[in-house]
Amino acid sequence: MIQIQSYLNIADNSGARKIMCIQVLGSNNPHYANIGDIIIGVVKDALPNMPIKKSDIIRAVIVRTKKTIRRNDGMSIRFDDNAAVIINQENNPRGTRVFGPIAKELRDKNFSKIISLAAEVV
């Protein structure tokens, strides 16, 4: 579960490394975000000479959380870190690669472009 002021790693090659959540957009609960929810964040750490700079306000979709997710088939899954992928206004990723495993719940929320870029879908 991600809330306001939570730090997330970035799982793509857009240039940002860490973001801080400042607002939860796509969630039933306005205080917490889970996998597949859209957040607004501010870049706290970025690579030099990249299009995304430190202190930029960006939109991102959450792809991994430390909080255990319970699936309908009884399986529970959790990841080692909280991570997000930076997206544009059309919900397409701004980067061209996605690193690390991605939860398959993103497919249900129509983020198929992120799923296709991911090397591993769990």
UniProtKB/Swiss-Prot annotation:
It is found in: Plastid, Chloroplast. GO terms for cellular component: chloroplast; cytosolic large ribosomal subunit. GO terms for molecular function: large ribosomal subunit rRNA binding; structural constituent of ribosome. SUPFAM superfamilies: Ribosomal protein L14. Keywords: Chloroplast, Plastid, Ribonucleoprotein, Ribosomal protein, RNA-binding, rRNA-binding. PROSITE patterns: RIBOSOMAL_L14 (PS00049). CDD domains: Ribosomal_uL14 (cd00337). The keyword Transcription regulation does not apply. Pfam families: Ribosomal_L14 (PF00238). InterPro entries: Ribosomal_uL14, Ribosomal_uL14_bac-type, Ribosomal_uL14_CS, Ribosomal_uL14_sf. It comes from the Eukaryota. One of its GO terms (biological process) is translation. Belongs to the universal ribosomal protein uL14 family. Binds to 23S rRNA. Part of the 50S ribosomal subunit. This is Large ribosomal subunit protein uL14c. It comes from Gracilaria tenuistipitata var. liui (Red alga). The gene is rpl14.
